[in-house]
Structure formats: structure tokens, C-alpha cells
């Protein structure tokens, strides 16, 4: 079962999260992703142990502040006795004196942040969810081209890495080569390089190249959202594949249960693969924005035929 320790979480966000109490239990294990709003637990309506980090923000602070101190203590105890791995107090939780007094009994790690609840959701909660996400390893190259995460796939030796190197020379970003870790968050896909292979590429005839050293750190990126898959096809695969000449519709590919747009590009001598890949990304962006080149071509052709008929 996947898990994350409170200590690892604090180290990851040491610039915005501070441990203020319960340091003896900093190795507590987070077993459930997300951040838990704890209204029902505070009210004593739920009594199951909590596996995720509990969050106390503006709403909880206002609710507690309306109660006498002794009642505040009872309400806070309702939460702490469920032994959450940690409790994180947002910037809006202004006074934690009563909480810390009650926590002398329970010694739950109490974390204080200078972030609001919404900011925590985009940063800390996203990070926690990433640690629990199902990861699938795929063979290919992951790039960011014109701001779009592109997963480049194809048979071994077809020229994926060579095409990627051309794209890197055009200042597109490398996320990873060969072994790509893909994971799902909600209905979105993200990808990153395996830790060992990060920043490296294998080019046939040259061997292993350290892209970060050769081109600079600015040409690589930790991860990207995958929006597009492009498959490079050999001559044999091309003969067995079906192509729509006009390309009016976007094909879809299923990765980890998420459907993403998909292009197939046949490889042959005389074709500049990297430029075709760039064109595919531009076409994808145009279609996503509502413009379809094939449909415009069809409309122009139809208008021309109608003019000829009128004559």
C-alpha cells in the first residue's frame, strides 16, 4: 500500500510549512490521499481513524471561536482522538493556543502554513495525490512542444530519440527519454522521467548524452501534462494502418483510462519528422481552439464547385 510520511511532506514544503507541535510523531504515515476538511469529526459525528492530513482553516476557526474555551477543547479533542497523521493550520487559522493545549494529550503533529486553503489545494494536496497516483511505465520520449505535453512512441530504432533531439535543438523541452512514468490525477495525465534516466538520452551511434549538461537546464523539465500522443510508424506499419487523407477528426488514444488526442506519422526518407511533429502539435492546438483546416478546405472546395455550377 502506498504511503507518505509527515516528515517527507514537511521536508518537501519546508519553505511554507512549519512543524509547531507533535515532533515525536513526525514519522506518522499518511495512508489516504488528499486533505480532509474535518467539520464532521469536530462535531463528533464520525469516529473512524483518519488516514489523511486534516486541515483547519477559516471556517473551522470561526466555528471554534464562537464557542467557550472549554467547549473548544472538547470539539478539538473530537478530531485529535481520531489520530490523523497530522493537522495542518492554514493562514486563516489565527490562534492555535487552545489546539496546542489539547494536543499535549494526543501529540498529533501540528503543521502551520502561510498559505490559504485554496493555495494548499493547488500545492500540498496535489503533491500528496501524486504520491498515491497509479504509475505506469511506458517506452517512448516525452517532450513539451509549444507548451503541449507530447508522448512520442514507436518501435525501437525507428528514430524517436533522434527526432526528439531535433526538437530540443529547436528549443522544445525534454521531460524524459526511453522509460517514462505516466500517472493519472483526476481526468488528467502527467508524465515524468524515471529518476535514473532524468536528463539523459540514448542516440544510436553516439551513445548516452547528458542533455542537461550539453544544452543547459533550461531545455529540460521535471514533468508535464500529457495532452497528445504521436506514434511514429515504420513502412510495414504504415501499410497496415488506415489514414484519413484530410485529417478532419482527431483520433483518440486511451492511456490509464484517459482519452488523449493521437496522431500517426509514417517515417520515410526525405521527410523531416521533427517538423511534421511540430505541425501535428500546431494542428492539435488549432482544433482545440475550434479551428479545423480540413473543414475550411472542404468549405472552400464546396464553394468553388457551387460557383462553377452557377456558371
Curated annotation (Swiss-Prot):
Binding site for ATP: 154-161
Entry keywords, A to Z: ATP-binding, Carbohydrate metabolism, Kinase, Magnesium, Metal-binding, Multifunctional enzyme, Nucleotide-binding, Serine/threonine-protein kinase, Transferase
Residue numbers binding Mg(2+): 161, 202
Cofactor entry: Mg(2+)
EC number(s) stated in the UniProt entry for this protein: 2.7.11.-, 2.7.4.-
Lineage: superkingdom: Bacteria
Broad enzyme group: transferase
Region of interest: Important for the catalytic mechanism of both phosphorylation and dephosphorylation: 201-210
Reaction catalysis annotation: [HPr protein]-L-serine + ATP = [HPr protein]-O-phospho-L-serine + ADP + H(+); [HPr protein]-O-phospho-L-serine + phosphate + H(+) = [HPr protein]-L-serine + diphosphate
Active site: 139, 160, 178 (proton acceptor), 245
Presence of keyword Nucleotide-binding: yes
GO biological process: regulation of carbohydrate metabolic process
Cross-referenced CDD domains: HprK_C
InterPro entries for the chain: HPr(Ser)_kin/Pase, Hpr_kin/Pase_C, Hpr_kin/Pase_Hpr_N, P-loop_NTPase, Ser_kin/Pase_Hpr-like_N_sf
Gene Ontology molecular functions: ATP binding; magnesium ion binding; phosphorelay sensor kinase activity; protein serine/threonine kinase activity; protein serine/threonine/tyrosine kinase activity
Keyword Methyltransferase included in the entry's annotation: no
An annotated GO cellular component: cytosol
Important for the catalytic mechanism of dephosphorylation as annotated region, ranges: 266-271
Entry note about domains: The Walker A ATP-binding motif also binds Pi and PPi.
Cited function: Catalyzes the ATP- as well as the pyrophosphate-dependent phosphorylation of a specific serine residue in HPr, a phosphocarrier protein of the phosphoenolpyruvate-dependent sugar phosphotransferase system (PTS). HprK/P also catalyzes the pyrophosphate-producing, inorganic phosphate-dependent dephosphorylation (phosphorolysis) of seryl-phosphorylated HPr (P-Ser-HPr).
Assembly notes: Homohexamer.
Similarity section: Belongs to the HPrK/P family.
Other remarks on this protein: Both phosphorylation and phosphorolysis are carried out by the same active site and suggest a common mechanism for both reactions.
Name the UniProt record assigns to this protein: HPr kinase/phosphorylase
Organism, scientific name: Mycoplasma genitalium (strain ATCC 33530 / DSM 19775 / NCTC 10195 / G37)
Amino acid at each position: 500500500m502506498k504511503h507518505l510520511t509527515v516528515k517527507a511532506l514537511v521536508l518537501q514544503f519546508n519553505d511554507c510549512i512549519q512543524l509547531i507541535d507533535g515532533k515525536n510523531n513526525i514519522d506518522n504515515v499518511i495512508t489516504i490521499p488528499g486533505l480532509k476538511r474535518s467539520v464532521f469529526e469536530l462535531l463528533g459525528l464520525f469516529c473512524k481513524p483518519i488516514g489523511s492530513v486534516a486541515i483547519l482553516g477559516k471556517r473551522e476557526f470561526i466555528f471554534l471561536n464562537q464557542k467557550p474555551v472549554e467547549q473548544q477543547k472538547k470539539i478539538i479533542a473530537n478530531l485529535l482522538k481520531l489520530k490523523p497523521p497530522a493537522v495542518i493550520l492554514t493562514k486563516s487559522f489565527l490562534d492555535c493556543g487552545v489546539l496546542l493545549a489539547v494536543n499535549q494529550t494526543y501529540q498529533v503533529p501540528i503543521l502551520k502554513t502561510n498559505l490559504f486553503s485554496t493555495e494548499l489545494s493547488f500545492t500540498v494536496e496535489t503533491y500528496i495525490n501524486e504520491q498515491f497516483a497509479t504509475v505506469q511505465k511506458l517506452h517512448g520520449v516525452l517532450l513539451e512542444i509549444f507548451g503541449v505535453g507530447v508522448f512520442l512512441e514507436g518501435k525501437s530504432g525507428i528514430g524517436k530519440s533522434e527526432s526528439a533531439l531535433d526538437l530540443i535543438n529547436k528549443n522544445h523541452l525534454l521531460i524524459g527519454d526511453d522509460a517514462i512514468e505516466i500517472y493519472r490525477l483526476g481526468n488528467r495525465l502527467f508524465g515524468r522521467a524515471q529518476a535514473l534516466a532524468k536528463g539523459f538520452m540514448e542516440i544510436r551511434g553516439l551513445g548516452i548524452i547528458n542533455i542537461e549538461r550539453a544544452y543547459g537546464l533550461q531545455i529540460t523539465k521535471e514533468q508535464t501534462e500529457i495532452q497528445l500522443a504521436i506514434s511514429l510508424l515504420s513502412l510495414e506499419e504504415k501499410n497496415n494502418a488506415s489514414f484519413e487523407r484530410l485529417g478532419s477528426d482527431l483520433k483518440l488514444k486511451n492511456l490509464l483510462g484517459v482519452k488523449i488526442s493521437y496522431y500517426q506519422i509514417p517515417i520515410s526518407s526525405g521527410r523531416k519528422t521533427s517538423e511534421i511533429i511540430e505541425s501535428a502539435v500546431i494542428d492539435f492546438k488549432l482544433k482545440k481552439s475550434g479551428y479545423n483546416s480540413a473543414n475550411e478546405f472542404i468549405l472552400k472546395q464546396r464553394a468553388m464547385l457551387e460557383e462553377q455550377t452557377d456558371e
